[in-house]
């Protein structure tokens, strides 16, 4: 098995994947540190178990209840043996996850003495380990280096003891896979009394054995999540060294199943169970079905992979292969593409120092950092699942990126938040990309990921091939432009209403009338829905019927007999509207640039059922309140000049955008960035030529298909007045426009900037199906400053055309006269 390392699985890993992991079809999954994947036969085995046995609540004496109790006891023992833990020395407490186990320990330490406890933790700890510091009444300390830990251990016996001390650290960094000295636990125990260790093994146990056979060297508390090992069930464990169990003696709270007697009238008294640690700590009814599923997980895991040693060997081989390929990848000028964050002493061939996780960022040939969010988005389009951000490891990430606390506070003040796309600040990355391998990873995963990096981020020559020549004077004096189509999107992120030919449409400072005046909001979170998460929203098609005064909404495929229709009055009277707060920051895919917006939600059950039933999401329609626009257009800038040193010959080279003065900023309703979005038919045509001429990907069949202009969701599509042929067009010339006039009244529009694109352009607006184009091609041909651009943001000028606001209209066929940036 020379090309697969020393893996000794019972079957070839590719055979296992084909049989057990159909969910991996056409997908490259590289986020096993988040959760690994469950096997098909695990779910089937658990299902057979549930349908063949009657399991009752364990807190009863009935036969079904006793069966549950027996299974829980057996699986608890099996879990201890899985980690080579002697049940005479250790007990295992079932909890929701590793974080719940950490909190249980920290809460118990806080209650163990009147003054509380002292807490120390390693800088490379998971956020949940860091959070325990807030409960430490005596104080806390973050150890920035291993040397600091070593020095502290050596002086433990000389330090004054004010109360119990707890030192926590990860067995393996969830950020970069670096493994920590296991010997600290035993040394701390030997060096001082009343000092305990908490070891976070959640990341480690995903791909490595965790051996507790030597109780004297073991941590006092170990926390883990079983889904990291098996993918399912969602269950965690706290493994307690019994000699440290007295820490829980003064725990105040008790729940059902943890007491032998409780008095509630008169004297308030209770007697805790004393037979085992887990009986005292497992409050209420155990998640016994999840625990029973854990039994199926142990069986399946052993049958598929043999042992954790096998998994460790397999993933170590793959990680080394990936690391070698990433660190040797070069641009045309010899500069490294991948910057891997790895301690110098760790080695991907040594399981005592390194696990199968790679933390990295990408750089251009000139050394500029490439934004993590953009890489993750592009990977997602290619069905490659990776992780980006601070990876729930704030200290390790900050240390790797050399960010100080003052730096991060400044970033927070500038608007940076967890999960947003503030990728680069002060010229440095704010987060990290992570690839993590699992038991069922294979060489194809490595090849696919490296092929993705090479295709999109390795610069093979000093110049990027331009699709158009630089702007020349004669180009600005050739045939003119006209409005090819007008589109209004009454419900944000839903289908377009095409303004009929010959119909003049009113335009205001907020944009085309009725554009993005409504949105769909999640009834639980208040978050606005969007096509990135719910692509079927493209099949919700509004029609503005001015003659009847209604917004007629149709759901379903065109000409489908199952289509349903709902009519919403355009008039706000008698519309069952309730004012509510639309919090855009409650989830990552913020749809209104992070603004918190007050909207009026429709309270009618008929309205909410219409949209909820179609999307399969509990949602309702909401409307932007009248005369209350406090949102202002803020198109994203920073495109760089046409002489940018990073992309000197980029197609449609971007001129420097001029910032809009605060006094002239335009109000918007529920649009993302600006009142109006414009694209060019010639640019769409050129993009499609590029798409059709590019090679297909591994998972594609046949020639790539052109995309419709509708995927860009523009309000205005302009076309050139060709005398013929179409090849005479000027694609991307709109990038040179500073302003334009439209129609017989010469309505003046300012160009605010270029439109930054995301994966939503991959949703086919006719079928609601997501693909990889045009985002893949845009990423190669329309990137500037690590952002992808296509189309231009517009706003109607507030003065200078002599027309009153209410008389401004545009129509399909109107002449468009652009003004160009100066040289």
UniProtKB/Swiss-Prot annotation:
Disulfide bond is among the record's keywords: no
Active site: residue positions: 392
Residue numbers carrying N6-(pyridoxal phosphate)lysine: 228
GO biological process, any: Mo-molybdopterin cofactor biosynthetic process
Region of interest: Disordered: 628-667
Residues in MOSC domain copies: 644-819
Biochemical pathway: Cofactor biosynthesis; molybdopterin biosynthesis
Superkingdom of this protein's organism: Eukaryota
Reactions catalysed, as given in the entry: Mo-molybdopterin + L-cysteine + AH2 = thio-Mo-molybdopterin + L-alanine + A + H2O
InterPro entries linked to this entry: Aminotrans_V_dom (IPR000192), MoCF_Sase_C (IPR005302), MoCo_sulfurase (IPR028886), MOCOS_middle (IPR005303), PyrdxlP-dep_Trfase (IPR015424), PyrdxlP-dep_Trfase_major (IPR015421)
PROSITE patterns attached to this UniProt entry: MOSC
Keywords: Molybdenum cofactor biosynthesis, Pyridoxal phosphate, Transferase
Cofactor: pyridoxal 5'-phosphate
Pfam families for this protein: Aminotran_5, MOSC, MOSC_N
One Gene Ontology MF term: pyridoxal phosphate binding
E.C. number(s) listed in UniProt: 2.8.1.9
Family: Belongs to the class-V pyridoxal-phosphate-dependent aminotransferase family. MOCOS subfamily.
PANTHER family per record: MITOCHONDRIAL AMIDOXIME REDUCING COMPONENT 1 (PTHR14237:SF19), MOLYBDOPTERIN COFACTOR SULFURASE MOSC (PTHR14237)
Role of this protein: Sulfurates the molybdenum cofactor. Sulfation of molybdenum is essential for xanthine dehydrogenase (XDH) and aldehyde oxidase (ADO) enzymes in which molybdenum cofactor is liganded by 1 oxygen and 1 sulfur atom in active form.
Alphabetized HAMAP family for the sequence: MOCOS (MF_03050)
Protein name, entry field: Molybdenum cofactor sulfurase
């Amino acid at each position: 098995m020379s090309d697969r390392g020393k893996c000794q699985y019972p079957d070839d890993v590719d055979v296992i994947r084909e049989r057990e992991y159909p969910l991996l079809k056409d997908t490259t999954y590289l986020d096993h540190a988040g959760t690994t994947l469950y096997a098909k036969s695990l779910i089937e085995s658990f299902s057979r178990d549930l349908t063949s046995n009657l399991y009752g609540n364990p807190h009863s004496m009935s036969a079904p209840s006793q069966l549950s109790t027996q299974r829980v006891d057996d699986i608890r023992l099996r879990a201890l043996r899985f980690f080579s833990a002697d049940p005479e020395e250790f007990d295992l407490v079932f909890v929701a996850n590793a974080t719940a186990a950490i909190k249980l320990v920290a809460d118990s330490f806080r209650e163990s003495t009147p003054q509380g406890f002292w807490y120390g933790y390693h800088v490379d700890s998971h956020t949940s380990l860091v959070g325990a510091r807030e409960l430490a009444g005596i104080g806390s300390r973050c150890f920035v280096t291993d040397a600091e830990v070593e020095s502290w251990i050596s002086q433990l016996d000389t330090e004054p003891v004010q109360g119990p001390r707890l030192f926590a650290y990860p067995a393996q960094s969830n950020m970069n896979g670096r493994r920590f000295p296991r010997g600290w636990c035993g040394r701390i125990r030997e060096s001082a009394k009343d000092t305990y260790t908490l070891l976070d093994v959640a990341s480690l146990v995903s791909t490595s054995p965790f051996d507790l056979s030597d109780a004297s060297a073991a941590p006092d508390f170990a926390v883990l999540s079983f889904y990291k090992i098996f993918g399912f069930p969602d269950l965690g464990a706290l493994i307690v060294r019994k000699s440290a169990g007295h820490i829980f003696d003064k725990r105040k709270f008790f729940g059902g199943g943890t007491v032998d007697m409780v008095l509630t009238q008169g004297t308030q008294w209770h007697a805790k169970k004393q037979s085992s640690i887990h009986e005292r700590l497992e409050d209420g009814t155990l998640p016994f079905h999840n625990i029973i599923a854990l039994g199926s997980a142990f069986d399946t895991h052993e049958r598929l992979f043999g042992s954790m040693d096998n998994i460790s060997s397999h993933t170590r081989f793959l990680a080394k292969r990936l690391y070698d390929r990433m660190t040797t990848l070069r641009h045309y000028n010899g500069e490294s593409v991948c910057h891997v964050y790895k301690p110098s002493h760790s080695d991907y061939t040594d399981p005592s120092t390194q696990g199968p996780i790679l933390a990295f960022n990408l750089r251009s040939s000139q050394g500029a950092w490439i934004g993590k969010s953009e890489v993750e988005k592009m990977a997602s389009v290619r069905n490659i699942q990776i992780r980006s951000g601070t990876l729930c490891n704030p200290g390790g990430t900050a240390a790797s990126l050399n960010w100080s606390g003052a730096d991060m506070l400044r970033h927070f003040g500038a608007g940076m938040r967890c999960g947003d796309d503030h990728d680069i600040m002060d010229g440095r990355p704010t987060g990290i990309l992570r690839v993590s391998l699992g038991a069922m990873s294979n060489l194809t995963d490595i090849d696919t990921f490296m092929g993705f990096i090479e295709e999109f981020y390795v610069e093979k020559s000093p110049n990027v091939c331009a699709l158009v020549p630089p702007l020349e004077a004669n180009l600005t004096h050739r045939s003119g432009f006209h409005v090819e189509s007008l589109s209004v999107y009454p419900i944000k992120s839903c289908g377009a209403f095409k303004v009929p030919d010959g119909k003049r449409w009113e335009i205001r400072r907020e944009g085309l009338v009725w554009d993005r005046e409504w949105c769909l909001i999640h009834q639980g979170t208040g978050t606005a829905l969007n096509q990135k998460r719910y692509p079927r929203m493209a099949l919700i098609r509004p029609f503005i019927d001015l003659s009847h005064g209604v917004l007629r909404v149709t759901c379903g495929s065109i000409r489908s007999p199952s289509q349903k229709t709902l009519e919403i009055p355009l008039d706000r009277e008698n519309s069952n509207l309730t004012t509510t707060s639309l919090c855009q920051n409650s989830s990552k895919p913020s749809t209104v640039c992070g603004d918190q917006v007050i909207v009026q939600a429709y309270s009618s059950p008929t309205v909410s059922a219409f949209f909820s039933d179609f999307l399969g999401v509990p949602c309702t329609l909401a409307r932007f309140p009248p005369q209350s626009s406090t949102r202002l257009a803020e198109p994203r800038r920073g495109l760089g000049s046409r002489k940018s040193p990073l992309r000197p010959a980029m197609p449609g080279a971007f001129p420097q955008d001029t910032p809009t003065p605060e006094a002239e900023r335009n109000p918007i309703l529920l649009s993302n960035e600006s009142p109006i979005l414009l694209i060019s038919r010639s640019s769409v045509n050129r993009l499609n030529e590029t798409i059709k001429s590019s090679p297909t990907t591994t998972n594609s069949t046949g020639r790539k298909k052109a995309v419709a202009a509708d995927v860009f969701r523009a309000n205005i599509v302009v076309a050139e007045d060709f005398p013929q042929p179409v090849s005479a067009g000027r694609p991307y010339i709109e990038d040179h426009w500073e302003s334009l006039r439209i129609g017989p009244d010469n309505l003046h529009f300012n160009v605010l900037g270029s439109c930054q694109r995301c994966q939503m352009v991959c949703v086919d607006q006719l079928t609601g199906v997501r693909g990889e184009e045009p985002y893949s091609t845009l990423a190669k041909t329309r990137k500037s400053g690590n952002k992808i651009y296509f189309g231009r943001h517009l706003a109607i000028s507030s003065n200078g055309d002599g027309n009153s606001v209410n008389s401004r209209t545009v129509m399909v066929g109107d002449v468009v006269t652009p003004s160009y940036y100066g040289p």
